[in-house]
C-alpha cells in the first residue's frame, strides 16, 4: 500500500512537472510568434535608426557648411590678395597701392559683367530649347502666375462696391436737382402769362 501511494505521488509530481514544462514551452512559442509578427524592424529599432540617420545628416550638413566656408575664404583670398603693409609708406607708395587696388577692382567688375552676360545668354538658350521641346511634344509653356493675396481681392471688391454705391447716390442727387429745376422752370413759365394778365387788368 505504501509503495502504491508513493508511486502515485511520484506520478503526480511528474505530471505537474510535465504540465509546467508544457506551459513554459507554450509561452515561449507564443512570444516567438509575436516577435515574428512584429518583424525585424521593431519600434525600438526604428527609433534608433531614425536617431542614427538624423545624426548622420547633421554631420554631413556640418561638413558641407565647413567645405563651403573654406572655399569662400580661399576665393576671397585669391581675388582680394593679402593686405598691404602701409606702415612707413610714403605718398608715392600709397598712390601705387591705391592704383593697384583700383585696377584689381576694375578687373573683377569686368569679369563680373562678362559672367552676367554669359548667364543671360545661357538662360536665353535654355528658354529657347524648352520652347522647342514643348513644341515637339505639343505642349504649351505655362505662364508664371503672380501670387495675389486673397485679402487684396476682398479689399478690391469692397472698394468697387463702395464706388458703385457712391456713384448711384450721386446720380440720384443729380436727378433730384434736375427735377427741381424743371419744376421751378415750369412754375416760372406758368406764372409768366398770368402775371401779365393781372398786370393788364
Curated annotation (Swiss-Prot):
Keywords: Acetylation, Actin-binding, Methylation
S-S bridge residues: none
Protein's job: Troponin I is the actomyosin ATPase inhibitory subunit present in the thin filament regulatory complex.
GO biological process: muscle contraction
Protein name, as recorded: Troponin I
Native source species: Astacus leptodactylus (Turkish narrow-clawed crayfish)
Annotated Pfam families: Troponin (PF00992)
Key word Cytoplasm present: no
Amino acid at each position: 500500500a505504501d509503495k502504491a501511494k508513493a508511486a502515485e505521488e511520484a506520478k503526480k509530481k511528474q505530471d505537474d512537472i510535465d504540465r509546467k514544462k508544457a506551459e513554459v514551452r507554450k509561452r515561449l512559442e507564443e512570444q516567438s510568434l509575436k516577435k515574428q509578427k512584429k518583424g525585424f524592424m521593431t519600434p525600438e529599432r526604428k527609433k534608433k535608426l531614425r536617431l542614427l540617420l538624423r545624426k548622420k545628416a547633421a554631420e554631413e550638413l556640418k561638413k558641407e557648411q565647413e567645405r563651403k566656408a573654406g572655399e569662400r575664404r580661399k576665393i576671397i583670398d585669391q581675388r582680394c590678395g593679402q593686405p598691404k603693409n602701409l606702415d612707413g609708406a610714403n605718398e608715392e607708395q600709397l598712390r601705387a597701392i591705391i592704383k593697384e587696388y583700383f585696377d584689381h577692382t576694375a578687373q573683377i567688375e569686368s569679369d563680373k559683367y562678362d559672367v552676367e552676360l554669359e548667364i543671360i545668354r545661357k538662360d536665353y538658350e535654355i528658354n529657347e530649347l524648352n520652347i522647342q521641346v514643348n513644341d515637339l511634344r505639343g505642349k504649351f509653356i505655362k505662364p508664371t502666375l503672380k501670387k495675389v493675396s486673397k485679402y487684396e481681392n476682398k479689399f478690391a471688391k469692397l472698394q468697387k462696391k463702395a464706388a458703385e454705391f457712391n456713384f448711384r447716390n450721386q446720380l440720384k442727387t443729380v436727378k433730384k436737382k434736375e427735377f427741381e429745376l424743371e419744376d421751378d422752370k415750369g412754375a416760372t413759365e406758368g406764372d409768366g402769362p398770368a402775371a401779365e394778365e393781372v398786370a393788364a387788368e
